[in-house]
Amino acid sequence: MEIFLTSISGILVILGMILVGFVMGEKGWFDDKSRGLIAKLVTQIALPCYMLYTITQRFTAADLLKMLPDLRFPALSMVILLGIATAVASIFAVKKERRGLFISMFFNSNTIFVGLPINQALFGDASIPYVLIYYMCNTTFFWTLGTYLIQRDGEGEAEFDLKTSLKKIFSPPLMGFMLGLVIVILHIKLPVFLASDLQYLGSLTTPLSMIFIGLSVSNAGVKQLILKKDQLLILLGRFVVAPLLMAAIVYWAPLPALMKQVFIIQSAMPVMTNAPVVAKLYGADSDYAAVMVTETTLATMVVIPILMVLMA
């Protein structure tokens, strides 16, 4: 019961901030441009600062080097999920014009905007390195295979652009993480004033991320949140297949219990918030992607407490 209440408490913290964003959206305080500004503040300023501060202040070189080989666990999970998603799309006759988007949303999860704050709320800062391991793998898969699949749905032939993909993979958050790694490995100590700046800016990550999700829910409109076949299959993939698969992969592995829990929670996160943006860019079904981001984000509030109890 205590575990359930703890997980509910963590979710309520997140839900409260999402509600603030939703109310502001309903009041018309933010237009498309200002919503984009919040997303840019999070991904290009707050999150890189948060990564850099957290890595340099809380971890040693030995801690970080020991964790890098564990990338193989989320990588294996995503490869298998990709195969399952492809089979499901074929068996259940998902529309060809949204099949690539469907597969991408099935096997990729929102590991930062939602995953990081939820893991922090549930497990504290000790979960951050494990969150980042999953994030590194997830973002690489999304900006390569995921983007290619979405582009294939859109107008014209899909092309794999290595330069563009590398630019997306090495995003500001990942660069902040990698810079933090270098600083820790080289035993460089940040000046106190710089560490404080990073801490203040990094602390914006969680509230701004949750407000952005609330604004997105408001923008999509509650009436659009209907459950049809394609929506139900994504929900099944995100919240049943993915966590069960990850649990099966890590169950016998000699990993810390916290790492196993974080990996399972990360695998059960909602659809990536970048999916609608990429879909819009390539002429795919961006409305479908936006609805799935909203539905899966809302469903997370129910799923995570259940997962916490099952993992106890």
Residue ranges and their predicted role:
Residues M1-A312:
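Alpha-helical transmembrane segments of multi-pass small-molecule/ion transporters
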